[in-house]
C-alpha cells in the first residue's frame, strides 16, 4: 500500500552521508538509492528521503523486518 507520495529518485551527497547518523543508535547509515532510504542496519530501520531531504525521525522510519516493532 502506498501513502500517495510519488517516489522520485534522488542521490545523497557522500559528504552528507558521512555526517548523518541513526538517531536511535547513533550508528552509520547506508544509502539505498533503489528505495530512496537511509538504512540503519543496527536499528533495523529505513529512513525515507523526500525531495532530497533525509527524514531522520524514528516515527517516520520503516522497520526493515515488517513484524519487528520500531525501537
Swiss-Prot record:
Record-linked InterPro entries: Trm112-like
GO cellular component, one term: cytosol
Entries under Pfam families matching the protein: Trm112p
S-S pairs: none
Source organism, top-level taxon: Bacteria
Sequence similarity: Belongs to the UPF0434 family.
PANTHER family: PROTEIN PREY, MITOCHONDRIAL, ZGC:162634
Protein name: UPF0434 protein Meso_3270
Organism of origin: Chelativorans sp. (strain BNC1)
Amino acid at each position: 500500500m502506498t501513502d500517495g507520495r510519488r517516489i522520485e529518485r534522488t542521490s545523497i551527497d557522500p559528504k552528507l552521508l558521512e555526517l548523518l547518523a541513526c538517531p536511535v543508535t547513533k550508528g552509520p547509515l547506508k544509502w539505498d538509492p533503489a528505495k530512496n532510504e537511509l538504512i540503519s542496519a543496527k536499528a533495523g530501520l529505513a529512513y525515507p528521503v523526500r525531495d532530497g531531504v533525509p527524514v531522520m525521525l524514528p516515527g517516520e522510519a520503516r522497520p526493515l523486518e515488517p513484524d519487528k516493532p520500531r525501537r
